[in-house]
Amino acid sequence: LDKQSCENVALDVQKDSGNCDILVNGAGGNNPKATTDKEYFEVGDIDADTKSFFDLDSDGVSFVFNLNFLGTLIPTQAFAKQMVGREGCNVLNISSMNAFTPLTKIPAYSGAKAAISNFTEWLAVHFSKVGIRVNAIAPGFFVTKQNESLLFNSDGTKTQRTEKILAATPMGRFGKAEELEGALLFLLN
């Protein structure tokens, strides 16, 4: 994500629609190079043909942090300039429950979303005197095109990973996007 390009987009939006009052930062995603093959490390994994913590690719980890964290920081820098000193302006960041209770196998994603949660708290204090309210939501697990093949077999049955995730989910099911609407509207009002 290029800061200058994002600032140009912010200026174009401002010209077309006026000042930005609401910014929702929804950047998110993972990279296979930033995941482990197994949930738990075992002594023999160092020499095995298994991708472990020790094999995480720094480029993959950087990709995940750039996508999630810089994908929140840079748009906020670009659009929040228009909010300074005005009333009723809001920044809403999308974090994840992984920030608080990390799933196994996805250390970079969990770490990047933890960075979003921490950054949101910092930014809320930082902007508190200039009329910009900053919050985040941290949804649980949702099925998306990006993760569908990890959660369901080709015949539509649940994978072992899905069974484990749902066993640790109080409602025993994945979330639905429309269930976030009330929280979003409340935080942006």
Spans of model-derived segments:
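A glycine/serine/threonine-rich, flexible loop-to-helix segment
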Residues: T36-F41, K129, F141-A168
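Conserved Rossmann-fold SDR core element
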Residues: D21, S117, F127-V143
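Residue(s) in the substrate-gating loop at a strand-loop-helix junction
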Residues: S96
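Alpha-helical segment proximal to the catalytic Tyr-Lys
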Residues: K81, V125-H126
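Active-site helix of classical SDR
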Residues: T76, A112
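Active-site loop-to-helix junction immediately N-terminal to the catalytic Tyr of the SDR YXXXK motif
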Residues: P102-S110, W122, L150
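C-terminal helical subdomain
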Residues: A136, K158-N189
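Catalytic Tyr-X3-Lys loop
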Residues: Y40-L73, L92, I116, M171
